[in-house]
Structures are given as structure tokens and as C-alpha cells.
């Protein structure tokens, strides 16, 4: 469970230097120095990698996002709330437990064969899949379209069928693959959810191509109905009711990154350290309330990561920040139960007393880590919900 503790500490150190982290009662004095010209940018890039944010955060929100929320971000925000709801009282989402990454897609092209054409009538949607990360396994996929009450035809049962457009042809009908069928009444209103998971195998093989989905509406007697007349809304609908697609993915385990090599401080930098005043907003505070020798046992300390201070609120939708915590303190023999130590740590601490020049001290490290949920925009303004593992320290111990 104690995975990537070095990255978590690096995150805390970088945030405090950049002004985006707040510490309470740090137990040790750490060196401080002024950053070089490129170091803040390099640190922000490393923080993005730790959090799983792809590339540089967008410089601004999508056009019109401030005027009226769009349907996909609203739905993803509901998913985020369900994922972070500890009470279990939120709306049940059957696909959430198996997904580490959830992506929404807004249709980029919409075509209709409507009343001006021969039957059957249909509505076609296209989605850009190029932002799907390589190596992800699709656990589920849904197409969501809003239906308004329809009086044409009046009080009739409608069959809504969805197909994937496998191959288009100039001289004949496109090759289609059946995905789902839903039955409802013409007067029904609300979001219609169609299962398109069966199309996911071709996504992973051809995610450099657009995904085409075609929707048909028929009555009980097989008569084709224009989807618009049946109350199904498309791109011209209000932003909060526009159709979109959602993919649920099981992310691969993050590879273990090589630890950063600490660069030795130059003489000029050491002089700068000595000249810097201590501030309770940064690393370098010795808490006077931890014993006459300034020593405190290994425990968890507060470290808050603020996306507002990092200037990322135009990219990160939720949360505005989170408590990452960090582990610090002494692991001094005898190790008691509150130090959450292992038998090996107890033995190492004992041998260290006898041979301090040979055997190092036992380290205070995270022993239990938990995930955070992060909701953000990607480069194409698609909304992403990611469950990032091993980001919050739940417990510390001597190991």
C-alpha cells in the first residue's frame, strides 16, 4: 500500500515552494532556497504527471461555458459527486466501481436523413476518439440523448435502435453493427441511455478514427419516424440537453517512476538559504510544542494541495484542492504501537543503536494510501473524471 511515497513528498515540497501547499506544524527544519527561472515550470509539469493531468492545462474554459452549463460536464459532475460521496446516499452508478477513468465526448458532426429523404429516417452522430489513452480497457460505454414529449405520433410506443457505422460507402448504404434497442412511449421525457459497449473493441483498434453512431426510431408496426419529430434532441438543443457519449475505462497501474536525483546545493545557493527568513506558510518551521529537543514521533501531518494557488481552476473542475498529508517524525527505539512499525523496523532500530555508523535509522513513511477523484478538461474540451490511486496518506508508520 505504501506506493510512490517519494512522489507524494516531492509533490508537497514543490507545492510549498510554489505557494500551493499549506503545512501545519512541520516537525523538522528543511533547507529553503530561491528557485531558478525554469524550476517553477518544471515543478508544475511534474505535479501534472503525478496527478495524471495530460499536458499543459487549458488556458481558458470552453467558449460559452460560463453562460450555460453543457450536458456532458453536468453529468460528469454528478458522477464525481457519486464517486466522492462517502455516505452512499447518491444516485447509484453501476459502472463506477470498475472504472478508474471516465471520459465524456461531445458529438463533433451530426447528420440527418429526415422528411426530405426516402425512408428510413435516421440521425447520425460522430465522436473524436483520439484522446483515449493507449492501453486502457473499456468496461462500459453509453450514448445519452434527451427526449422531449412528442405528440407526433400521439401516445405511441416507439422503438429506438442504435447502430455503429462500421464502414461508409459512396454507392450503397453504410455497413452497420447493432448496439442497443430501447422501447418507450412517445410522451416520455428525460435522458435516454443506450448501451454502446459492444463497439468498444473497434475503438481500441481504430481510436485514431471518428466513431459514427446511427439512431433509428420506429413505431410498433415498423413505420420509420424522424428522430426529431419523436422528441429526440440533437446539437441544436440547449447546451444542457445536447447528446453526448461516456466511456468507462479501467486504467492500467501507473508505472513506478524513477526517483529524482537530488542536486547538490552550490555555495551561492547555501548563502541564499541562510538569508531566507522562516515563514509559517512554507517548509522550515520547527514546532516548539514537540518536546524539549524538538523531536516528535512519526505521525501524519497536514499538507493541502490547492489548485487555485496553482492557477488551474480553468482546467480542473473539481475539487479546488485536497488534503494529501505527509509523514514525518522520529522512529526511535523502543518503537511503540502508535508508531505502526513492522517487526523488521523494530529489529533495525535496535541494531542502529548498537551500530549507528553502519545501520541507518528507521524511516517514517506512509503505510496506507487512498485515491482522489479529479474532474478536469482535456485539450479538446472533453470532460475527464479520473480516480488517481495512492494520492492521500491515510496512515504513517516506522518501516
UniProtKB/Swiss-Prot annotation:
Deletion consequences: Absence of primordial germ cells, short or missing allantois.
Location, primary (coarse class): secreted
UniProt note on tissues of expression: Expressed in testis. Expressed in decidual cells of the uterus and in trophoblast cells of the labyrinthine region of the placenta and in the inner root sheath of hair follicles of early postnatal skin. Expressed in the extraembryonic ectoderm in pregastrula and gastrula stage mouse embryos. Expressed in brown adipose tissue and brain.
Source domain of life: Eukaryota
GO MF annotations, alphabetized: cytokine activity; growth factor activity
Sites where a glycan is attached: 155, 340
SUPFAM superfamilies reported for this sequence: Cystine-knot cytokines
Cleavable signal peptide: 1-19
Cysteine pairs bridged by disulfides in the record: 298-364, 327-396, 331-398
Intracellular or extracellular location(s): Secreted
GO cellular component terms given for this protein: extracellular space
Protein function: Induces cartilage and bone formation. May be the osteoinductive factor responsible for the phenomenon of epithelial osteogenesis. Plays a role in calcium regulation and bone homeostasis. Involved in the generation of primordial germ cells; this function involves Bmp4 in a synergistic manner though separate receptor complexes seem to be involved. Required for the initiation and maintenance of spermatogenesis. Signaling protein involved in regulation of thermogenesis and energy balance.
SUBUNIT field: Homodimer; disulfide-linked.
Entry protein name: Bone morphogenetic protein 8B
Native source species: Mus musculus (Mouse)
Underlying gene: Bmp8b
